[in-house]
Amino acid sequence: MWLYTFAVALIVIAQEINGEPHTRPSSATPLNATLPPQEEGSAQNTTDAAVGSRLSTILRDLPTIKNISIFICVLTTLLITCLVIKICRSARKIRKTRKYDIITTPAERVEMAPLNEENDEEDDSTLFDVKYR
């Protein structure tokens, strides 16, 4: 939801940078309207004008579209960079996993002990809770 709000705010800001928001002229004729035979040539001109007005609208808004596209590309690049940095940092932190074995003693006491005792340089204070069912 915050992304949608951010996108709307960005569009509003971009419109304010380029000036007042422009309203598009309605060049469409009603669907049930009939043209007299002498106006058939002007119907072709109306269609050309409608296409021309759409293109002029796109061309008028081209700087805004360009600014939004550049912003989205920069944001995507930043996100990808952050993910790559996070992956590189986590790859450095991966340590050799210690494997544990179950040692059973009388009176149902169970404890965990490392299998390889030669790597006891670290003070390992991991506690294991065993629950009996």
From Swiss-Prot:
It is a single-pass type I membrane protein. It is found in: Cell membrane; Golgi apparatus. It comes from the Eukaryota. Residues 1-19 form the signal peptide. One of its GO terms (cellular component) is Golgi apparatus. Keywords: Cell membrane, Glycoprotein, Golgi apparatus, Membrane, Signal, Transmembrane, Transmembrane helix. Essential for Golgi structural integrity. PANTHER family: EXPRESSED PROTEIN, MEMBRANE PROTEIN FAM174B. The chain crosses the membrane at residues 68-88. The keyword Lipoprotein does not apply. It comes from Danio rerio. It holds the Pfam family DUF1180. The keyword Cell membrane applies. Belongs to the FAM174 family. Residues 22-47, 113-133 are annotated as: Disordered. Glycans are attached at N32, N45, N67. Residues 117-126 have a biased composition (Acidic residues). Its main location: membrane. GO terms for biological process: Golgi organization. Residues 20-67 are extracellular. Residues 89-133 are cytoplasmic. This is Membrane protein FAM174B.
